[in-house]
Amino acid sequence: MKLCVALDLSTKEECLQLAKELKNLDIWLKVGLRAYLRDGFKFIEELKKVDDFKIFLDLKFHDIPNTMADACEEVSKLGVDMINIHASAGKIAIQEVMTRLSKFSKRPLVLAVSALTSFDEENFFSIYRQKIEEAVINFSKISYENGLDGMVCSVFESKKIKEHTSSNFLTLTPGIRPFGETNDDQKRVANLAMARENLSDYIVVGRPIYKNENPRAVCEKILNKIHRKNISENDIEQNYEVIQQKEWDMCNHFEEWIKTRPDKEHALKEFYAKCGIKY
């Protein structure tokens, strides 16, 4: 699992300063529509000069097939490492994009946007007349069958997408709140344990990092958890929401429950199993 830091700050200077603070970390940077329109294509060059960051250019192209292919071709010339398009543009648009990018010796990864994480079921249904999960699976199959590299989706759809396509079909999951932060404008959010359990390949974290007084320390903490194969007893409190999400009703509070266990080691194994983590 890779960490992608969203550069969604108010000014280019703030974004570059954050990038400098995060030098030499094993991370990706996400450049969104706001930053790209404000700072232009040269902003990508400036970020690459700070460090050899992998760049995800998050512009979510959605237009007629030829226009989408033109746009994807142009941004691919910038040397970005990942771009995205809307799956709802259809298979012809997807095919044209991938045909156009096939001429590059090293093209960026191309992911499809399924359902924005700002959608809840009610709002999504009012537009698409489908449940989110049904639409996401349909979009994923179309994207996979027509040569895309993966999907942008919520954590809650990641594992199901792989089940209906391939374990190698990438999933990038926004809306990650690593330490239980507020949802802000996201509806379908999750924590690190959920992302791991649902096989996310990339997680996008923005505000919990750049709004912190020490962004680098937050990134290091996240990376430490990503690279840790198993969780320790110190992670129990931070993963309590996973227990709640699994509707584990052995007691009102996990801390109270584990105190009642004569064999703490066995209790921890049960905890790992409920979180979907190999002990």
UniProtKB/Swiss-Prot annotation:
Gene Ontology process terms (BP): 'de novo' pyrimidine nucleobase biosynthetic process; 'de novo' UMP biosynthetic process
Membrane-spanning parts: none
Active site: 60 (proton donor)
Keywords: Decarboxylase, Lyase, Pyrimidine biosynthesis
CDD domains per record: OMP_decarboxylase_like (cd04725)
Pathway in which this enzyme or protein is active: Pyrimidine metabolism; UMP biosynthesis via de novo pathway; UMP from orotate: step 2/2
Enzyme class: lyase
Keyword Lyase: yes
SUPFAM superfamilies according to UniProt: Ribulose-phoshate binding barrel
SMART domains reported for this sequence: OMPdecase
Role: Catalyzes the decarboxylation of orotidine 5'-monophosphate (OMP) to uridine 5'-monophosphate (UMP).
PANTHER family: OROTIDINE 5'-PHOSPHATE DECARBOXYLASE
SUBUNIT field: Homodimer.
Name under which the protein is recorded: Orotidine 5'-phosphate decarboxylase
Taxonomic source organism: Campylobacter jejuni subsp. jejuni serotype O:2 (strain ATCC 700819 / NCTC 11168)
